[in-house]
């Protein structure tokens, strides 16, 4: 009986210790979650102004910002297009044109754009253009990097200006590339090229003039 009484007397202490451990674990978990939240909040991304092209930093989760040079408003909204669209898009967020989506009669201004559907306009990107469909792009095209996938068949009505290009599909158009242009093995490029550096994989084809510019 004495052993039972001693055991019973220790139970409250054991329970208190257990509760304290649980409380510490909960507080530690909350502190970790708060730390992750603030890390996400403090993460920055580079944004190019739509008005003056000045590049500044803004919170990664922000929906808009103001240019630190000219004070202009810069939208950071992302667009996902699933149907026909002909309204203005001016953002430094990202744009995705889905397979059933189509964009016509406008110049899309954004950061990155992924085209899985139809695009018959122009593109002005501060980031990457990725084309994975059949498109005839009638407007001007400028970007940091252009990626044309092997399933794509693209015709550019005007000269394409980019820093880097990776082509693995069928392309018609003229290119001015200030960096490297890479024709992968499935690539077929019909058009003239002005480029600083060029790589042509075995199997790739190019019809046109090449001008190497330092």
Predicted regions and their residues:
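Short cysteine-rich clusters marking metal-coordination/redox-active sites
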Residues: 49-52, 65-70
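Residues at structural and domain junctions
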Residues: 35-38, 53, 105, 157
């Amino acid at each position: 009986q004495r052993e039972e009484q001693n055991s019973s007397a220790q139970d409250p202490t054991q329970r208190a210790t257990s509760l304290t451990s649980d409380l510490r674990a909960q507080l530690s978990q909350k502190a970790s979650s708060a730390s992750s939240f603030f890390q996400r909040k403090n993460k920055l991304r580079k944004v190019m102004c739509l008005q003056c092209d000045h590049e500044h930093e803004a919170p990664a989760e922000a929906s808009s910002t103001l240019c630190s040079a000219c004070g202009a408003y810069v939208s950071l909204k992302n667009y996902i297009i699933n149907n026909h669209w002909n309204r203005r898009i001016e953002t430094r967020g990202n744009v995705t044109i889905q397979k059933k989506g189509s964009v016509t009669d406008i110049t899309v201004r954004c950061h990155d754009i992924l085209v899985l559907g139809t695009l018959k306009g122009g593109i002005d990107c501060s980031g990457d253009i990725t084309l994975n469909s059949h498109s005839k792009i009638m407007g001007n095209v400028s970007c940091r990097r252009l990626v044309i996938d092997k399933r794509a068949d693209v015709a550019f009505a005007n000269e394409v200006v980019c820093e880097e290009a990776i082509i693995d599909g069928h392309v018609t158009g003229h290119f001015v590339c200030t960096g490297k242009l890479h024709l992968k093995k499935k690539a077929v490029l019909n058009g003239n090229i002005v480029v600083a550096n060029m790589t042509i994989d075995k199997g790739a084809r190019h019809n046109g003039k090449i001008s190497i510019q330092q």
